[in-house]
Amino acid sequence: MRTSQYLFSTLKETPNDAQVVSHQLMLRAGMIRPMASGLYNWLPTGIKVLKKVENIIREEMNKGGAIEVLMPVVQPAELWQESGRWNDYGAELLRFVDRGSRDFVLGPTHEEVITDLVRREVSSYKQLPLNLYQIQTKFRDEVRPRFGVMRSREFVMKDAYSFHVDKASLQETYDVMYQVYSNIFTRLGLDFRAVQADTGSIGGSASHEFQVLASSGEDDVVFSTESDFAANIELAEAVAVGERQAPTAEMQLVDTPNAKTINELVEQFNLPIGKTVKTLIVKGATEEQPLVALVLRGDHELNEIKAQKHPLVADPLEFADEAEIKAKIGAGVGSLGVINLNVPAIIDRSVAVMSDFGCGANIDGKHYFNVNWERDAAMPEVADLRNVVEGDPSPDGKGVLQIKRGIEVGHIFQLGTKYSEAMKATVQGEDGKPLVMTMGCYGIGVTRVVAAAIEQHHDERGIIWPSDEIAPFTVAIVPMNMHKSESVQQFSEELYRTLKAQGVDVIFDDRKERPGVMFADMELIGVPHMVVIGEKNLANGEIEYKNRRTGEKQMIAKDQLLAFLKENVKA
């Protein structure tokens, strides 16, 4: 491609409303342009990258035995009503009525559509297992679109759905897809972790997220220093450290009128925060027990996903308000504790091994110090309620935990029969009876992958694509003063034609621009291999080569240039 025939839309300045690096660089590199909140036009440079990512995904999915289909973005409401998600999905589901007064949605996902398709097309267990995928536009009416294409309202997604006669067959395909995803992200050159995850609104049992490690990520990714253990912080098991020690002091009731929070208590009474506990009151799951207390160490955070899975706790988790707490317990939020508590309590594992700790007295303006289990309070039910912290023991007993930020780019689920049962998707089983199909679901955010690659791979000059395979162009020809030098123009034209004939994705900068502008643009869009052709070097039989990824510069003999590029460039 010649720049003179290309829409080369780079910007010198960073737009003020772009918060994260990927958004800034995608705008500056001329990859995207905003149209409305959360909606973007993809320009030629961006679409080249997007299509290359799609092709890698497509190739690896095909290798894994999946079959490509394409389903409509517009979906009839009846399918969502049939699955039960019409009322459950929430405001992200964009609904509309057509001219025939029929309800439709813009698809945020395609579980209903694929289940309907397969129940119509597949009738016998002999046709299973079946794994179908598509690369298609999705729409989710995000309440606050942000971070460019990282969290936009319209995006491209690869979603696959597998159908099976039983869980054993599903597990086989799930394992294959786990490996396929690992192959995809490895081929893309990304530093990622496959982590245990919560199934969320999709439903089902087993689930893994594929997280690209980046400081701008929205998720906390937990992994061991000495094993393959990795999990989203929502699911990472927190292990209690040490054993409970014997009491060393008598319990005291202390006036604490100005200590309404753990931090105020610690500061005013010079207590180690690890020797305090906090009591959180949440809604219970039953009318008989409308309120439940969750008790954590003062320096730990409640893990809401873990808490709401407890049978006593309402799902979704909901905190009780001040009036409810005061009416039931008789004290305000800042004075709650485990002594004489009149609602069921669940304590975190780390609280169960504490001794001589401080907690609220369930009397406003008072706390107990030097509290000990069994001596001063009966030991309540113990459960894993908290988020892990860096340095915690790994739950597999190998090493300690590290925590890094991650960008979720892929997610695989074992759905089971959640959708097939609701939508009566059955086949004739081996025994001749109707058999509800067991399902798996496998998604990759294609547009998000592009942004995640930039978040992880960039410098002050622009994008550094982690793989030649996804760069918009693999080679840039940058001729110095070509329009004033016949030898430079002749060599550049000949090199361009040769590389094109060899199938190299090459951009030839034939603009009448200063060399500095040309270099800056090619570095900004992240072309991994730059060939600089100058009149003086050419006369000496040499060509300058620059590697965007390593920063290396070297002179290559003119007659060795093609061989050098063939060896170093992945076309």
Curated annotation (Swiss-Prot):
One of its GO terms (biological process) is prolyl-tRNA aminoacylation. GO terms for molecular function: aminoacyl-tRNA deacylase activity; ATP binding; proline-tRNA ligase activity. Gene3D superfamilies: Anticodon-binding domain, Bira Bifunctional Protein, Domain 2. The keyword rRNA processing does not apply. Keywords: Aminoacyl-tRNA synthetase, ATP-binding, Cytoplasm, Ligase, Nucleotide-binding, Protein biosynthesis. It is found in: Cytoplasm. Its EC number is 6.1.1.15. It catalyses: tRNA(Pro) + L-proline + ATP = L-prolyl-tRNA(Pro) + AMP + diphosphate. The keyword Aminoacyl-tRNA synthetase applies. InterPro entries: aa-tRNA-synt_IIb, aa-tRNA-synth_II, aa-tRNA-synth_II/BPL/LPL, Anticodon-bd, Anticodon-bd_dom_sf, Pro-tRNA-ligase_IIa, Pro-tRNA-synth_IIa_bac-type, Pro-tRNA-Synthase_IIa_type1. One of its GO terms (cellular component) is cytosol. Homodimer. Catalyzes the attachment of proline to tRNA(Pro) in a two-step reaction: proline is first activated by ATP to form Pro-AMP and then transferred to the acceptor end of tRNA(Pro). As ProRS can inadvertently accommodate and process non-cognate amino acids such as alanine and cysteine, to avoid such errors it has two additional distinct editing activities against alanine. One activity is designated as 'pretransfer' editing and involves the tRNA(Pro)-independent hydrolysis of activated Ala-AMP. HAMAP family: Pro_tRNA_synth_type1 (MF_01569). Consists of three domains: the N-terminal catalytic domain, the editing domain and the C-terminal anticodon-binding domain. This is Proline--tRNA ligase. The gene is proS.
